[in-house]
Every structure is written in C-alpha cells, then in structure tokens.
Amino acid sequence: MKLNDRHMKRILLIAFALMVAVAASAKNYKWDTEILYKGAPDAYTEKMCRLDVAYEEGGQDRPVIVWFHGGGLTGGWRHIPDALRRDGAIVVGVGYRFVTNVSLAETIDDAAASVAWVFQNIEKYGGDLSKIYLAGHSAGGYLVSMIGLNKAYLAKYGIDPDKQIKALAPYSGQVITHFAQREKQGIANLTPTIDEFAPLFYVRGDAAPMLVISGDREVELFGRYEENAYFVRMLRLNGHKNVTFYEVDGFDHGDMAEPAHLLLLKYIKNQK
C-alpha cells in the first residue's frame, strides 16, 4: 500500500499527538538495562550481546516488541525508540556483534539468542508469550527477516518462529544478501546476490505474519523499495496469506522509521 500525501499528513498529525502521548506514557515505564543475553567467551561478546527492557510495572499479558537497531551490521547501538514506549507494550532493545568482528552467521545467531532470552524471561515483566513481535530498521530489519524465515537460527534455541512469533516487522530491510556480507566477499555494493544470507532465499507460505514497510521508492536506499516489493510478491506467490506492505511517501531510508513505528503500533492494536 502506497501512503500518499493525504495519508502522510494524517500520519504526521498522529505523530504529533503521539509525541505528546509518549511524553506522558513514557513516565510510567521502568527500565532494566545492560542484560547479558548470551554466554560471553570474550570481552567483545560481553560488551555487545546485551539488551534493555522498557516496561510498565504491574502489567500483565502485554505485547512484546523485540527491537533490532540499524547500522549496516557494522555500527549503531542498541536503543528503544521512544515512539514504541506506549500503550503498555514491552519493548526490548537488542545489541549484537558486528560483521567487522565476527561472521555474519554469528551476528544472526546473536539476534536469535536475544529472542530466546525474551521467551525465557519476559513473563516476569508482564509480557505475553503469544504476543511477541520482532521488529527492526535497516540492518535490524534484515536480522528480523533472517531469523524469522530461516528457521534453523531459532530452532537452535527450541523456538519455531512460524508458531511462536506473532509477527515479523522489518522496516526497510535488505532482503538480498546483505551488502556488508557482499563487501566481505569482494562483491560490489550494487551487484545483487541471493544466497544463504538472503531472506529472499527462504520465502515460503507458512512463515509468521509479516508487516513489511519501505520508505519512498524515489528516495530509498539502493532500490530498497523494489527489493521489498519483490520480497512481498514472492512471499505471496509462495502462498503466504498474511503479508501487509506499506510504502511511506516522502520518507527516505533514514527517517522512514518514525512513521513505521505508528504503523507497527496500529498493526499490533488490530491483532486478535
């Protein structure tokens, strides 16, 4: 669905109202930070494989958003978007190791390990294990799609993403082989490949529900809209019946996350 100027004006008005609401709602949130979610055999793992939890004290049966930051798999830092701290949702901000220091498979495994931690611990914060959403922007969106579609990553931790994840919500994520991996292989940035490190390699009809969001096709990064449009088409051709796709007009790769947060919250609110 392409969100035109009229839709975007409405979203921006909602965004302004949301900022006011978040300021009030965020005051009710408690924080648990610097939680090590994975065994730390070295100082780098101990530094990077940590997560933060934002939650409302006393809540029960709350939806849980596991959030993966962007940064090209080579940078960025874990955080919890202010816009997601509302309506009682529990938000988990995940850090992970970068491909400059470890293999891409290890980075993806970090993402899977963090989700395993959530399943093992989030109930004590009031989270509902049947309402766990995986979301992320850019590189974070890529990680969401990889662990949601290549079942081997979460199966290692006893989790079936098709049955146990409420929905996958990648924002402007790479769906071909990630450019950071292609760079390590000596492949040019604008030369696309699809291999075992491409979410497209794993498209299937029985995956978890998906909310796929892209920025404006005219200002997105490296044809990212077209990548995601093809991704959605291939999911549907493979029989997936629960894929929602948005393009947000006027927003580039960097700033599309703000309206995407609103779309995710609305999506969660509409789930049964």
Where are the predicted features?
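Hydrophobic h-region of N-terminal signal peptides that target proteins for export
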Residues: 16-25
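The feature captures the conserved acid-bearing segment of alpha/beta-hydrolase catalytic domains
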Residues: 159-162, 167, 173-179, 191-229
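C-terminal catalytic histidine-bearing segment of alpha/beta-hydrolase fold enzymes
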Residues: 213, 229, 236-272
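Short amphipathic alpha-helix adjacent to the substrate-entry channel of hydrolases
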Residues: 77-94
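Primarily recognizes the serine-hydrolase "nucleophile elbow" in alpha/beta-hydrolase
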Residues: 119-183
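Short beta-strand element of the alpha/beta-hydrolase
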Residues: 61-70
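Alpha/beta-hydrolase active-site loop
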Residues: 103-123
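N-terminal cap/lid segment of alpha/beta-hydrolase-fold proteins
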Residues: 27-59
